[in-house]
Amino acid sequence: MVDKRESYTKEDLLASSRGELFGPQGPQLPAPNMLMMDRVVKMTEDGGKYGKGYVEAELDITPDLWFFGCHFIGDPVMPGCLGLDAMWQLVGFYLGWLGGEGKGRALGVGEVKFTGQVLPTAKKVTYRIHFKRVINRRLVMGIADGEVLVDGQQIYTADELKVGLFKDTSSF
């Protein structure tokens, strides 16, 4: 039985990274340091811009986060690719929440725009994922648009985020 709540704590997300949240066949989130959220604050099957599902999650920003020490020395900024990866993570998490099974793999993105940055002085990053379609056949795949906000201001958008769940990744 899938653990289908509307919100999840950091402990829940860590359980997902160990394969304990959505069962032994469900997709896993990455473990820290690659886990790019502290909590999921909202999940619905019928919300979002397209009425086909919505996920909202948050990451607390502190100056001691690992990436600020190396990207870049003297000019610390969160790598934009980590925000993109967080959106892919949330698409896969949603597929597990729906009961999908398999190993999650990012399959692509249509267009990404960066119009701002996450600095060590920020307080919170918010991720919003708006599902356009979920395909549940031999391949389970989610297609969604996403946005990243820092302290309430939109700084990234991504169209056509795609994540698939694979029962066998040996030929992927």
Curated annotation (Swiss-Prot):
Gene Ontology biological process terms from the UniProt entry: unsaturated fatty acid biosynthetic process
Q: Where in the cell is it found?
A: Cytoplasm
What are the record's GO terms for cellular component? cytoplasm
Q: Which GO terms describe its molecular function?
A: (3R)-hydroxyacyl-[acyl-carrier-protein] dehydratase activity; trans-2-decenoyl-acyl-carrier-protein isomerase activity
Just give the chief location class.
Answer: cytoplasm
The protein's annotated pathway = Lipid metabolism; fatty acid biosynthesis
- EC number(s): the record gives 4.2.1.59, 5.3.3.14
Q: Name one Pfam family in it.
A: FabA
User: Which InterPro entries does the annotation name?
Assistant: FabA (IPR010083), FabA_FabZ (IPR013114), HotDog_dom_sf (IPR029069)
Instruction: Please list the residues that make up the active site.
Output: H71
Q: Which reaction does it catalyse?
A: a (3R)-hydroxyacyl-[ACP] = a (2E)-enoyl-[ACP] + H2O; (3R)-hydroxydecanoyl-[ACP] = (2E)-decenoyl-[ACP] + H2O; (2E)-decenoyl-[ACP] = (3Z)-decenoyl-[ACP]
Q: Which keywords does this Swiss-Prot/TrEMBL entry list?
A: Cytoplasm, Fatty acid biosynthesis, Fatty acid metabolism, Isomerase, Lipid biosynthesis, Lipid metabolism, Lyase
Q: Which family does it belong to?
A: Belongs to the thioester dehydratase family. FabA subfamily.
| Subunit and partners | Homodimer.
Role summary: Necessary for the introduction of cis unsaturation into fatty acids. Catalyzes the dehydration of (3R)-3-hydroxydecanoyl-ACP to E-(2)-decenoyl-ACP and then its isomerization to Z-(3)-decenoyl-ACP. Can catalyze the dehydratase reaction for beta-hydroxyacyl-ACPs with saturated chain lengths up to 16:0, being most active on intermediate chain length.
The entry's protein name is 3-hydroxydecanoyl-[acyl-carrier-protein] dehydratase
Organism of origin is Pectobacterium carotovorum subsp. carotovorum (strain PC1)
Q: Which gene encodes it?
A: fabA
